[in-house]
Amino acid sequence: MTQSTTEDTLLRLAAVIDSRKGGDPEQSYVSRLFHKGDDAILKKIGEEATEVVLAAKDVRQGGAPSALVGEVADLWFHCLVALSHFDLSPADVIAELERREGMSGIEEKALRKRREREENGG
């Protein structure tokens, strides 16, 4: 799968998720999540993140890698719901990843801390 195809897939899925805002919670799982509010969405992300960890541990012990892929897909999906809820999109995340590209994690973390200090007047 190419990068543009991956980005296109995320943007298409995000558009479908956005279209569920204000929808009938009896007809759509995503509409139901939006209707319940951000606490329900965030709780679901926490649950899915835990399932990713457990699936990864299973793979480490010889479990099916496809289970891990499925759990990561669930996590990404619910993260897309959260982004939509807060009027953000995958493009915002992609832009941030592109900004970090080529920068070591240590360097990126130091830069982030420096920015936080500057923003807080320190």
UniProtKB/Swiss-Prot annotation:
Keywords: Amino-acid biosynthesis, ATP-binding, Cytoplasm, Histidine biosynthesis, Hydrolase, Nucleotide-binding. Pathway: Amino-acid biosynthesis; L-histidine biosynthesis; L-histidine from 5-phospho-alpha-D-ribose 1-diphosphate: step 2/9. It catalyses: 1-(5-phospho-beta-D-ribosyl)-ATP + H2O = 1-(5-phospho-beta-D-ribosyl)-5'-AMP + diphosphate + H(+). SUPFAM superfamilies: all-alpha NTP pyrophosphatases. GO terms for molecular function: ATP binding; phosphoribosyl-ATP diphosphatase activity. It is an enzyme of class 3 (hydrolase). It is found in: Cytoplasm. InterPro entries: HisE, PRib-ATP_PPHydrolase-like. Coiled coil: none annotated. Its EC number is 3.6.1.31. It holds the Pfam family PRA-PH. GO terms for biological process: L-histidine biosynthetic process. GO terms for cellular component: cytoplasm. Belongs to the PRA-PH family. This is Phosphoribosyl-ATP pyrophosphatase. It comes from Burkholderia mallei (strain ATCC 23344). The lineage of its organism: Bacteria, Pseudomonadati, Pseudomonadota, Betaproteobacteria, Burkholderiales.
